Amino acid sequence: MSEKLRRCRKELTAAIDRAFEGVRHSQECTAQQRLDAPSLTSQPVHRLLCRNPLAACPSAAPYSGASCAPESENPAFGTHHIPVNSKLQQPLYPKRKPLTSKENVLMQSSILARDRQFWRAAGDGEDWRKDSLRKDMERDLKADPNVLLSSSSQEVTKDLLDMIDHTSIRTIEELAGKLEFENELNRVCGHCQDSPFKEEAWALLVDESPQKALDADPGSLKQALDDQNIVETVLDLEEDYNLMTSFKYQIE
């Protein structure tokens, strides 16, 4: 076993040495070719342009019509005979100026004058949001014309659009909060209609003093106070929601 390992080691070492010799030989050949190759950068540019491709091949030399003229005899390389083409001096494409550079804005401010009618003042943001909200709702209604809306659905939609136009609602979130508040108010009113103290609760909802209602029925003090607490809680919730909404838009 040791003899086999020793023989494998020798063969592996010999293969590695041969590989290194091949790499070294290829590097030496490449370096020699670079040294033997003529440097094109050392020659003048006019000699490179004047070089005849047939002159490089000895077999094609007899068939070449004319050899390259010397530098002093070739009129193409004279300092006073250089042809100048005016068309070549002009650029193929006009130089485009950047659209948002500071120089263009300052020097060519008249370009922006025709677009001033599209600018929107800072106070138009609320109206623009209302219009966009209204257009979104109208587009949702027109999305499926095959579906026939009932009269109640049309009335609800009309009420929502009127609410958008006549209130300070700007987003869907505010509209949802308004509807949630009205649903809660309707639920409280529904409970008041089922209660025996309907008139006292209704007086609280229309901001009348509960003392006037208590004069007619002193036994309804507890129920009236409970109803008043419910209404005040709902109003406080609405006020907190409005404050949070306005604070959110101020941050944005």
Curated annotation (Swiss-Prot):
Free-text tissue specificity from the UniProt record: Testis-specific. Highly expressed in spermatocytes (at protein level).
Cited function: Essential for normal spermatogenesis and male fertility.
The name this protein goes by in its record: Uncharacterized protein C3orf62 homolog
The keyword Phosphoprotein is annotated on this UniProt entry: yes
Signal peptide limits: none
Changes seen on gene knockout: Male mice are infertile with smaller testis and epididymis, but female mice retain normal fertility. Spermatogenesis in the male mouse is arrested at the spermatocyte stage, and no sperm is found in the epididymis. Germ cells apoptosis is increased without changes to the serum concentration of testosterone, LH, and FSH or synapsis and recombination during meiosis.
Organism classification: Eukaryota, Metazoa, Chordata, Craniata, Vertebrata
Residues modified as Phosphoserine: S195, S209
Keywords: Differentiation, Phosphoprotein, Spermatogenesis
Keyword Phosphoprotein set for record: yes
Pfam family of the protein (one): DUF4712
A GO BP entry: spermatogenesis
Superkingdom in the source lineage: Eukaryota
